[in-house]
Design a protein with these regions (language model features):
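Transmembrane-helix signature of 12-pass secondary carriers
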Residues: 1-362
Length: 362
């Protein structure tokens, strides 16, 4: 049995859940930084006298960086390793986030937010790859959704940090705290193993064999003496252009459109919601409380989706969550009271993030 087949035949155990948590924490810090901006906007705009257009640039420039970082991160991970890119990207966005706290003006803040985006964008796809390459195919969907759930935890962390620190110490404090994940890089380097398929493709077969042998021993399985490599392990990776050719073209188009809808609705609402509520006359603290409740609803959405993908399938779960999210979004927009906004906001958050998690399994 070749090395990759041995890896895939391992029973799900302590190692897989440990990897999920270790990679998930990196995802959490990523989401915390992304979520922090939505809470900072409410006070930053007033303190610096920024127009809605200027605040829009503070948000948008980060997404520009994320798009560039995602492309760069994926390609670089194939050259220098998933683990290396995962660690370096965390360092990049942690430093850039901390620098946002000392930005003297809007121009410098935009520069720092751009590099934050580059780091965040590079880390996200690599995190999914690391987990998916270690987890057996039969439970991969559930693990990817659970990994995505750390995104909700990250936004929850952002809401808590903003609630307790921004009213008391100002928006600078949130960015300083957002830079602390840089110290997590030592845990990444020590406890997260490099991707086995990557090691094989780079000719580092002995290292890949050693990792799988250790996992087999931990699982109480007989350890193979020889490191066999299947021919499939060294195949050329799928090129981007092939995604738009049969049989992938239709699926690629649909997944892109669905992803656009999920991300547009999520960021379009939750990034601006704190500022919109403040503009409606609510205090900063009350606003953060309302948004915090809505963010809490994301977590059961992920967990429900993680169960349903294995019960009724990924396609049915995704379709159901998207349909329910659309209904909730309509009533959320029609909400004429705080109660209506919070209730429909919670339900919308539940289904939106559940769909987000399922989409990542395709």
């Amino acid at each position: 049995m070749d090395i990759v087949a041995r890896l895939q035949s391992l029973p799900v155990g302590r190692f897989h859940y440990k990897l999920l948590v270790l990679v998930g924490l990196g995802w959490l810090f990523d989401a915390m930084d992304t979520g922090m901006v939505s809470f900072v906007l409410a006070t930053l705009g007033k303190e610096w006298g920024l127009s809605p257009k200027e605040l829009g640039w503070v948000v948008s420039i980060g997404f520009v960086g994320m798009a560039i970082g995602a492309v760069m991160g994926g390609r670089t991970a194939d050259k220098i390793g998933r683990k290396t890119v995962f660690a370096v990207s965390l360092v990049v966005y942690s430093i850039a986030t901390a620098l946002c706290a000392v930005a003297p003006d809007l121009g410098w803040l935009l520069v720092f937010r751009f590099f934050v985006g580059v780091g965040l964008g590079a880390q996200l796809p690599v995190a999914v790859t690391l987990v998916s390459e270690y987890v057996p195919a039969k439970v991969r969907g559930r693990f990817i959704v659970l990994l995505e759930s750390f995104w909700g935890l990250g936004w929850l962390a952002a809401a808590l940090v903003s609630y307790f620190f921004i009213p008391q110490y100002g928006w600078h404090s949130a960015f300083l705290i957002g830079g602390l994940p840089i110290f997590y890089v030592f845990f990444i380097w020590k406890y997260i193993p490099e991707s086995v398929p990557y090691l094989i493709n780079k000719g580092r077969v002995d290292e890949a064999h050693a990792i799988v042998s250790r996992l087999e021993a931990e699982a109480g399985l007989p350890v193979a003496e020889k490191a066999l490599v299947a021919q499939a392990a060294s195949k050329e990776p799928l090129r981007f252009g092939q995604l738009w050719q049969p049989p992938f073209a239709k699926r690629t188009l649909m997944l892109w459109l669905i992803w656009f809808g999920i991300v547009f609705s999520y960021y379009g609402i939750f990034t601006w919601l704190p500022k919109l509520l403040v503009d409606q006359g609510y205090t900063v603290i009350k606003t953060f409380e309302y948004v915090l409740v809505m963010i809490l609803a994301q977590l059961p959405g992920y967990f429900a989706a993680a169960v349903l993908v294995e019960k009724i399938g990924r396609k049915a779960t995704l379709a159901g969550f998207l349909f329910a999210c659309a209904i909730c979004a309509y009533f959320f927009g029609q909400g004429g009271s705080v109660t209506a906004v919070v209730v429909w906001g919670c339900l919308m958050s539940f289904f939106n993030l559940g769909a987000w998690g399922v989409h990542g399994t395709f």
